[in-house]
Regions:
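Acyl-CoA/ACP chain-elongation machinery
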Residues: 1-51, 81-95, 129-136, 153-181
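Glycine-rich, phosphate-binding/catalytic loops in enzymes
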Residues: 10-13, 76-77, 141-144
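Buried hydrophobic packing segments
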Residues: 60-63, 106, 143, 173-180
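An N-terminal domain-start capping segment
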Residues: 98, 121-140
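Surface-exposed alpha-helical interface segments used for non-catalytic interactions
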Residues: 99-101, 141, 174
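Alpha-helix capping/termination and helix-coil
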Residues: 107-114, 129, 133, 147-151, ...
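Glycine- and aromatic-enriched membrane alpha-helices
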Residues: 136-154
Length: 181
């Protein structure tokens, strides 16, 4: 649910994008004077801040046996659950040891289950990608660190927030749906 207090808080931190920021950036990049709202959130480019969005979703989980028994359309499997919540601060979260642990463990899980070749040649990374300058720097650093450590030369990275905005509580669901297609 989009609440006014969320807008006020993000704006107070300077994390929200604004028409003025968009207009200034478009002028700097020579993108014309008419505001192009499709470029409002730029997670990996010239960052202006996040856009609040709204979504919801659900996933039905079942064992392999049950899925085959009922003829379910199997879209993926859960290898492991690696999570880190660092939003307990009164400022924009920066990467801590938990962030590195979660991402590193995920790389290890993919390599262990699917092998080195799949990890290096057939993987993609759906980033949190809020569109704030701090997120771009910290998230890019974490992903680059592990890609290098695991010998990955090219790792496609994307974020759905450039199209959906930051949907807060359901942002992880958006990313899951993006991964499953």
């Amino acid at each position: 649910i989009i609440m006014p207090s969320a807008f006020i808080g993000f704006d107070a931190m300077g994390a929200m994008t604004t028409d003025k920021r968009l207009k200034d950036l478009q002028a700097l990049l020579g993108e014309g004077e008419e505001l192009d709202y499709t470029k409002y959130c730029r997670p990996f480019g010239d960052n202006m801040g996040l856009v609040v969005g709204e979504s919801s979703g659900f996933v039905i989980l079942m064992s392999d046996r049950l899925a085959l028994e009922v003829g379910a359309n199997i879209r993926g499997c859960i290898l492991n659950v690696n999570i880190n919540a660092d939003g307990n601060k009164k400022s924009i979260s920066g990467p801590g040891a938990g962030n590195y642990f979660s991402v590193g463990k995920t790389f290890m899980d993919v390599e262990e289950v699917f092998g080195d070749k799949v990890l290096k040649e057939n993987s993609a990374f759906i980033a949190h990608g809020t569109g704030t300058p701090l997120n771009r720097i910290t998230e890019s650093h974490i992903v680059s660190t592990f890609a290098k450590e695991f010998g990955i030369e090219s790792l496609p990275v994307t974020s759905l927030k450039s199209k959906l905005g930051h949907t807060m509580g359901s942002a992880g669901m958006d990313q899951l749906f993006g991964a499953l297609g």
